Amino acid sequence: KLAGMTGTAKTEEEEFRNIYGMDVMVIPTNKPIARIDKPDLIYKTMEAKFRAVVNEIEEIHKKGQPVLVGTVSVETSELVSKLLNKRRVPHHVLNAKNHEREAEIIEGAGQQGAVTIATNMAGRGTDIKLGEGVRELGGLHVLGTERHESRRIDNQLRGRAGRQGDPGSSQFYLSMEDELMRRFGSDNMRSMMERLGMEEDQPIESRLVSRAVETAQKRVEGNNFDARKQILQYDDVMREQREIIYKQRMEVLESDNLRKIVETMIKDVIDRTVRLHTPENEVPEDWDLMAIVNYMNANLLQEGELEEKDIKGLDPEEMVEAITEKVIARYNEKEEQFTPEHMREFEKVIMLRTVDRKWMNHIDQMDQLRQGIHLRAYGQNDPLREYRFEGFEMFEAMIASIEEEVSMYIMKAQVQQNLERQKVAEGKAVHQDTSKQEPKKKQPIRKGETIGRNDACICGSGKKYKNCCGAGK
């Protein structure tokens, strides 16, 4: 049974239910929430927004109330830090560049007058403890410089303030140039700001604005959910195939006798080969019996062991039966030569190696298919349906390939006796003791008689050596 606990699951309720079949239950807080969540402030430009953010931080800092500034990226956190340095407001920056000081910075973030700039990942899972006199000032104030694509992350940022019944407040500062607003913001909101002729530094503060932003976030979440759901549907195809292969592999590992499995594989290979060359829509005279004979002799039997006359005049079922009988007889002979114990071990090794290699190749092929399958949509075909169909065909082909390779290796394996290994195993020396052998005497190097080029040739022709046998030397 799957279960989990988190403070921000409610916004993802639909995904938990549809994909994992899990319901989301909201448990009441331990103590009543005293945090005040102020409506969003939306500005016309990003420049105006950051001016307002810095002004707000400076005001709150003067009161002594601690501020936690949440940013979407490291770049934004450094920009806010730069602006605060110009105003000479002391602060700490908590991002990926100085994560080693994370514990120290978080510990002081709730102290009076503290200003902390943090990305959404920094300092998560840590309660910011309020210092002396901070509760009277209103607790920790969380200031968001931008809305995230997911409401869940915004809720995590808000939740840094007002923990365990402590006082606190939160507010987000937005601009029409923010990534979220540019991609998913309402055109009505833009035209409304233009019609009102609002100044750059004049914000809109309205629950309607906050709701419009939440609607934009829901659209993003919906798009992301659809993308994850589609990925899961594609992954389900591989998951089903993986379960089948792993189940069969486990059976091989746990089994002490694979003979029945091997015999089934051999019969399947014979049946497939016979069916391939004896189609039902052809008359027996047109069947390619020689192709069956050549395949069987090359992969399952010895050369010449099966002849065309052995299967001529038989229907496909009788052919399969006749060939299977020959192959199983050959299998029994091989087992006698190899001994049953060694045969079982050999079968297991061959089967595991073949399955592992073929499965790895199949994963690569499925990955290649997945990368280009979306192009089928241009042909008015459903890419997911095409992926399932072709993936199943490829899986069937892989299973057939495993059966053929295992059958061939087992039936074509040669039993070789390694005499030297046997002697070593018995403790006998492979070579005689060289200490008792007499050292070989070095033979003198004999040089033949050299003949000058102008001397008489040794063949007795009377010619000079250079003009006879020595010509060209």
Curated annotation (Swiss-Prot):
Stretches for region Disordered: 424-447
Reaction catalyzed: ATP + H2O + cellular proteinSide 1 = ADP + phosphate + cellular proteinSide 2
Record-linked Gene3D superfamilies: Helical scaffold and wing domains of SecA, P-loop containing nucleotide triphosphate hydrolases
InterPro entries recorded: Helicase_C-like (IPR001650), P-loop_NTPase (IPR027417), SEC_C_motif (IPR004027), SecA (IPR000185), SecA_CS (IPR020937), SecA_motor_DEAD (IPR014018), SecA_SF2_C (IPR044722), SecA_Wing/Scaffold (IPR011116)
Signal peptide limits: none
Membrane-related topology note: Peripheral membrane protein
GO BP: intracellular protein transport; protein import; protein targeting; protein transport by the Sec complex
Protein name according to UniProt: Protein translocase subunit SecA
Organism: Cytobacillus firmus (Bacillus firmus)
Gene coding for it: secA
